[in-house]
Amino acid sequence: MENIKVAKVGNVKFVNKGNELNGTLHLTAYHSIFSISENGKEIWTAYSMINNVKLCSNEKSFCIRIQCRDFMFFCWRFQSTEDAMDVYDTLQELMSINSINMLYAFYYMPSGDEEKLPSSWKSFLLENEYRRMGVGDSTQADGAGGNWRITKINENYSECHSYPQALAVPASISDSVIYYGCKYRSKNRFPTLTYLHKNSFSITRASQPLVGIRQNRSAQDEKLVEAIFATSIIPGKENLIVDARPSTNAMANIAVGAGSENMDHYRFAKKIYLGIDNIHVMRDSLNKIVNALKNTDISAAPPLIELLNRSSWLKHLANILQGAVLIVKTVHFRHAHVLVHCSDGWDRTSQLCALPQLCLDPYYRTIEGFFALVEKDWLSFGHRFAERCCHLPGKRIFTIDSSYSEEPPQSSPSSTLQYTFSTVRSALSGFSIDHSEKMMSPVFHQFLDCVWQIMDQFPNCFEFNERFLRRLLYHLYSCQYGSFLYNSERERAQASVSTHTRCIWDYFLSRKDEFKNPNYVPYDDVIMPDPSSLRWWSASFAQPDENMNIPSPSESPSL
C-alpha cells in the first residue's frame, strides 16, 4: 500500500442503472468499499471481479466507469479531475499483480461458521468417485464394473501433466499399452473413464489424435479405445466417438500434426462432429453481450435486444446441450459407449462430459454430487481456469477516454452502428484482445448457464437453487478461494494451494441452507432437457428477466 496515491476520497457519487448514491470511497489492498452517506451501508467490490476500468472526463464530469465480471457495471463520479486520476492510478497499482500467489485467496481469512468448518480440500477423492460408480466392482449384476481398474500410471503427473494421478481404464489394458498410446493424443491426454452409468455403459474423454498429414496411427490407441467399448457389449449397438468441433476445424488441425480419428482404424464405432465453436468464438459471443449491457451504469434503460441476439450466446448453448442430449441418449437408451474429445480435451470436452452426467445421474443433482462433478470433470481433468478466466489481467484493462459522453446510445439502426464502432474504438469490450487474453474464454460460465437451463426446465430435480449457480459463477472470478486458481491439479499441488488457501466448497457448506431448493424432490430417473427451449439466464447478467426474455409472437428472438 506504500506506493498508492490515495486510500480514501470523499464526496463521491456511485452510479448504477442511472441511480446515484453519495458517499465516501475507500481503497484497500483487495477491495474497493463505497460507504453510503445516507445509511452507512457499504458496497464492496473485489478487484479480481473488475474486468474494465475506464477513466472518463470532459468539461463537466470526472468519472471512472467499472465493468465487473458478474455484470455489475457502475460509475464513480468525482468532484475533481485530481481525485479521479488519483483513484485511477491507485487502482492500477493495486491491481497490477503478476503472480497467482499474490491473489486474495492467499490472504483471505474466513470468519463465523466458515472458520469453524473443517477444510473441504480432502473431501473429494477421485478414486472414491470411481468406486461409487462401480469401477472395479465385479459383484454388480452384470459384473461389468470389474472390467475397469484404477491405474496409477500418472502418479506424480508423470505421463500427462494435465490429468489427475488416479485414472480408470479397462482392466484388460496394461499400463504399457497406455504408456505408448498416450503419445498419440494431444498433450498425452489418452482416452480414460469419466463416468460409468448404472447400465455399465461409459463416457470416456480424451484429446484429439495426432494424425497429421501423414495419417499417423497408433495400434495402442486403437487397442485402448476398442477395449473401452468392449467393457460392456450388446450385440448390434453402435458406439460413438464424439468430436465436439466443427469438421472443418478438425480437418484444419491435420496441417499442424493433429486432426481426428481415421475411422478405418476404429471400425467398432461411428464418429460424429458436433460443430461447437472454439474458445475464441465463445469469447466474442460474450463480448457482444457486454457491449449490449455496458451502459447499465449510467442508464436504467434495458439492453439493446438486437445486440443481445447478435451475440448468438443461446445458439452456442443450444449446440452444447444438443451434444449433451445425444450422449445421454446413446448411453442410457441405446446402451452404447461414448468417447468425447475436442482439441486438447479440457474445454468443450469438459462441458460435454459433465452435462450428460447431470442428466443421467441424480447424485450429481445434489449439492454434494455437484461438488464432485465439478471436482472431477473440471478441476481433476485440467480445465485451464487461470487462462480461461485471466486471473492476472494486469494493466491492459485500464483505459482513458477524454471524449466521454454521459448519453447512452439510442436503439436505432444508425445509433447501433455508431455504438458498435464506438465500442471497438474505445476498447470498452469486456474482453479486449491482447496476448494474454487469446486464451480467455467463458467455457465454465457456459457450463453453468447450461446447468441453469436444465434447472429451468426441471425446477424440482435439483437440491441446489439458482443462487448457488450465481455464487459459483461469482467465485470463479473472485479469487477468494484457491479451487479455481492455476490450470491443473498438478499446478495447484505444486503451489500447495490446499495448504495456503480455502476451498470453494467451504463457502457453500457453511451457508448450505441459503443454497437449498425448497421445492427439491429427489428424482432417480434420467432427465432430458429440450435444447430448443432456452432462455436468457438474466440474473447472471445482473438484469431483471423482462429486460432479456421478451416474448415473441412467432419464434424466440434469442435463438
From Swiss-Prot:
The keyword Hydrolase applies. It comes from Schizosaccharomyces pombe (strain 972 / ATCC 24843) (Fission yeast). Belongs to the protein-tyrosine phosphatase family. Non-receptor class myotubularin subfamily. Gene3D superfamilies: Pleckstrin-homology domain (PH domain)/Phosphotyrosine-binding domain (PTB). It catalyses: a 1,2-diacyl-sn-glycero-3-phospho-(1D-myo-inositol-3-phosphate) + H2O = a 1,2-diacyl-sn-glycero-3-phospho-(1D-myo-inositol) + phosphate. Lipid phosphatase which dephosphorylates phosphatidylinositol 3-monophosphate (PI3P). Involved in the control of PI3P-dependent signaling and in the maintenance of endosomal system integrity. It comes from the Eukaryota. Disulfide bonds: none annotated. This is Phosphoinositide 3-phosphatase.
